[in-house]
A protein has these predicted regions:
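Metal-dependent phosphoester/phosphodiester hydrolase catalytic core
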Residues: 1-201
């Protein structure tokens, strides 16, 4: 924060910060290994993630949520009667990057985790704002290859698995969330996303 331009930006422009994989390592999940990556002197990915989250929480301009929720990154930012912004966390509660073709939900198919999905659905249902904006770490329909598993199957970093047909893997959790939004009749939900290096609507 020694740069006058950075300080000016922070004092004049509202910012919403989100946890990203690069706080730890590219395409971070608990399954990631940096054992053969010479850039890392610390090889324990969970320890790297804890250090990255601490640095993020100490540096990011976020409103505190109290001692009980000091490590929680997902949050709601009310913007008056026009908008509620739901900032979700697609990194801290996800299962390992895998072949992403599991037929049933479980810890290995989590992207948000059950508590966060329920928090989001409950918040969207309670919201009286005209627009419900979901700020997502990454697009929900993007498929990002992340190497191969021990059996030679493609591993996936994001929600989608690149397969046609019924949802499988991480898509199951997202399908449950989207179905919950539809079944509750929640209107004016808009997804805003980052992580990709282009704009689209």
């Amino acid at each position: 924060l020694m740069d006058a331009n950075v300080r000016a930006l922070g004092s004049e422009v509202a910012q919403i910060w989100q946890w990203d994989d690069h706080e730890v390592t590219n395409n971070y999940s608990d399954s990631k290994s940096v054992a053969n990556d010479t850039r890392y002197t610390e090889k324990n990915v969970q320890l790297l993630a804890a250090r990255g989250q601490r640095a993020f929480m100490e540096y990011a301009p976020m409103r505190p949520f109290g001692a009980a929720m000091h490590q929680r990154l997902y949050r709601r930012l009310p913007q008056g009667p026009l908008a509620d912004i739901f900032v979700i966390d697609m990194r801290s509660h996800r299962g390992p990057n895998s072949h992403n073709l599991q037929a049933a939900e479980g810890p290995d198919t989590d992207m948000l985790g059950r508590p966060q999905v329920q928090w989001l659905l409950d918040g969207l249902k309670r919201s009286r704002a005209t627009w419900k904006l979901i700020a997502s770490d990454m697009p929900i329909s993007l498929f990002v290859p992340d190497g191969k598993d021990a059996e030679g199957r493609a591993q996936w970093e994001a929600v989608a698995n690149g397969e046609h047909g019924a949802p499988r893997g991480r898509e199951l959790e997202m399908a449950r969330l989207l179905k919950g939004i539809k079944n509750a009749g929640i209107r004016n939900v808009v997804w805003l996303t980052a992580d990709v290096h282009y704009t689209a609507a």
